[in-house]
């Protein structure tokens, strides 16, 4: 039994190491992609390639109540994941909110970034058609379609390259909040739209491969935990000799 547990412990450590390596390899690859783009292309202020950079507000400030669906989908920082929306838990507000705060009514393709709290800098594209608005912890960036692709910007803002810029080279520094001015002045590497799409496709492939590896090693860790539990149960039941 001791030998079996030792083997399971080694297998668990190897799976955890491989899982971490898969994540780090993806991050390093994305960082290299954007670093190469910066070295080979000029940069442009984000305000020059977007039609809007703004943030939302609190319904309470506007005298607006939360409601059950249907209503206006109210996107908060909890709903903005890394390159994906997280809509398992959603909130809705009265339709009047969109009349009172028109500037932050969402359109499909808007890029959303968290600007307050632990998830600061986390970015996703609003890729659904629901009528929606955002709160004060989320920044909205609307790209000029002939200059900047939303998915390119989302990958850029989630990349280690951006994190280094965000923290002035100190990747472990905490930052309390980001201002709209920060984003308006932020310099983005700007290849043409065709090259941007190639970059998005390249990162999509890397992300798919990383997700597949993570799924395999996560499943392996679950199997190891289940096997350990099964051995313990058999040992307590006296079924092992």
Q: Predicted regions span which residues?
A:
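A short glycine-rich beta-alpha junction/loop motif
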Residues: 65, 115-116, 131-139, 148-151, ...
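Interdomain signal-transducing alpha-helices
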Residues: 153, 157, 196-199
């Amino acid at each position: 039994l001791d030998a079996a547990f030792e083997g399971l412990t080694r297998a668990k450590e190897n799976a955890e190491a491989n899982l971490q390596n898969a994540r780090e390899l993806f991050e390093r690859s994305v960082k290299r992609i954007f670093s190469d783009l910066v070295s080979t292309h000029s940069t442009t202020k984000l305000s020059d390639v977007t039609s809007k950079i703004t943030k939302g507000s609190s319904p309470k400030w506007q005298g607006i109540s939360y409601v059950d669906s249907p209503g206006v989908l109210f996107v908060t920082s909890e709903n903005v994941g890394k390159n994906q929306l997280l809509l398992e838990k959603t909130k809705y507000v009265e339709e009047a909110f969109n009349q009172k705060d028109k500037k932050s009514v969402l359109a499909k393709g808007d890029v959303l970034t968290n600007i307050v709290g632990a998830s600061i800098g986390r970015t996703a594209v609003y890729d659904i058609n629901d009528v929606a608005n955002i709160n004060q912890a989320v920044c909205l960036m609307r790209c000029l379609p002939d200059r900047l692709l939303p998915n390119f910007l989302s990958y850029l803002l989630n990349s280690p390259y951006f994190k280094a810029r965000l923290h002035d080279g100190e990747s472990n520094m905490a930052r309390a909040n980001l201002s709209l001015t920060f984003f308006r002045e932020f310099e983005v590497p700007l290849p043409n739209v065709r090259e941007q799409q190639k970059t998005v496709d390249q990162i999509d492939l890397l992300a798919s491969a990383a997700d597949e590896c993570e799924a395999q090693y996560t499943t392996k860790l679950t199997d190891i935990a289940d096997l350990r539990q099964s051995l313990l149960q058999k040992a307590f039941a006296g079924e092992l000799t």
